[in-house]
């Protein structure tokens, strides 16, 4: 359900659109430099978060090295688990945004606000000249 929540937030159905094409593989996002990664890359079946501590050393080193070697990255930390990784991101040369995890909105049966996606697009346009295209219209 998290991807569906993200889809609704980035499309922002409060604004009228023509026909919408959303790439569920997120390949179109990857081509624009967007990487969506969880704080744990695996888990036991039906046990969300069961491998979080196993992946913790890898994720902390990944974020620390990435944020030191590549500056100007816009990090979006979704949820409390992701926010615990914030100290490993160099905030002096990168931007860190925070939002509740999409699963929170699914549990609450609420719509996730589109503000974080709008902010990423705004910052990307300011820094690199082009906003992120979260979906296509036809």
What feature does the model see in each segment?
Residues 94-102, 133-138:
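Short flexible/disordered coil segments
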Residues 107-109, 113-138:
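C-terminal functional extensions of proteins
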Residues 1-74, 82-89, 95-98, 104-107, ...:
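A polyanion-binding, active-site-adjacent surface
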């Amino acid at each position: 359900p998290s991807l569906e929540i993200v889809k609704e937030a980035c499309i922002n159905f409060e604004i009228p659109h023509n026909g919408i094409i959303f790439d569920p593989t997120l390949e179109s996002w990857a081509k624009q430099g967007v990487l969506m990664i969880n704080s744990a890359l695996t888990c036991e079946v039906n046990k969300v978060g069961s491998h979080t501590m196993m992946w913790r050393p890898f994720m902390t080193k990944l974020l620390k090295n990435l944020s030191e070697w590549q500056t100007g990255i816009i990090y979006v930390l979704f949820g409390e688990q992701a926010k615990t990784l914030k100290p490993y991101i160099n905030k002096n040369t990168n931007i860190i945004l925070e939002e509740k995890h999409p699963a929170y909105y699914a549990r609450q049966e609420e719509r996730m606000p589109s503000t974080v996606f709008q902010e990423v697009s705004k910052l990307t346009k300011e820094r690199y000249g082009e906003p992120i295209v979260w979906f296509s219209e036809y």
